[in-house]
């Protein structure tokens, strides 16, 4: 496989992974991640759904139903998979769709799962179709079918699996096949975070990092973090570094402005790529409509990156319209870029 598979256990004395590296287990990867529902901020309906489902499953002494999370990247899907494993007292194995190139890769993982263990597949929409087909009986009947020989000599042998829980995550739920999508019992969409929830995350993370930050500064970071916890934590770390070296260790709004200017993040949270995306539509294509392939070719960026990373926030902020004839920059986008609205 091209990508690593990580295995975690709810037993604190167990190793993080059989394939761990310093990068995998570094402080930055895990130190800010909530360990339980009490510390998890946001996605309230999803959390409540999972609390109820987990409590019911534990009362019946059954594994949890299969779970599918979908939404933009960085909103806490992987973190919730860790919390589910901790709440259920089971082990968590993490992989991704592109890493499961062959059916044998998937089968090898499934056969090592114990009852109730969780298999988290990120980017599950990128599973090869031949690999995906092995999941159907595995999810529904907890079995995998092996076919031996071909033609009139073909024989099928069914191998029983322990009852596991599949947690899938995707940024492109529309690309999932109906047979796979319909096999998930719990289906939840992740939304961008409010500024209030992001400010709570900043306060919590700052406390864990030993930083002092006031309410004005937490809201300033929240405002410029694209509604995304992963980004707000990353920006907080950059601000921490900046004030440590350039600002006497004191976090102020002006220090945040200076630190984020170095990162190319403007007052609305747009990055250089976001602004280039909007400028391309306005300057090269008269404000649109224009197809995503044309935008990608002009920017020399992959269309998947634009669709998954750039567009969701621009749509949520009202800076972009996505129509049947293509993408259009809104009046708000013109104003933000300081360009005269063409109407």
Curated annotation (Swiss-Prot):
Give the multimer and partner information.
Answer: Homohexamer. Forms an RuvA(8)-RuvB(12)-Holliday junction (HJ) complex. HJ DNA is sandwiched between 2 RuvA tetramers; dsDNA enters through RuvA and exits via RuvB. An RuvB hexamer assembles on each DNA strand where it exits the tetramer. Each RuvB hexamer is contacted by two RuvA subunits (via domain III) on 2 adjacent RuvB subunits; this complex drives branch migration. In the full resolvosome a probable DNA-RuvA(4)-RuvB(12)-RuvC(2) complex forms which resolves the HJ.
Q: Where in the cell is it found?
A: Cytoplasm
Task: Kindly list the organism's lineage.
Answer: Bacteria, Pseudomonadati, Thermodesulfobacteriota, Desulfobacteria, Desulfobacterales
Listed binding positions for ATP are 32-33, 74, 77-79, 140-142, 183, 193, 230
Q: Which residues cross the membrane?
A: none
The intrachain disulfides are none
Identify this protein by name: Holliday junction branch migration complex subunit RuvB
CC terms in the record's Gene Ontology section? cytoplasm; Holliday junction resolvase complex
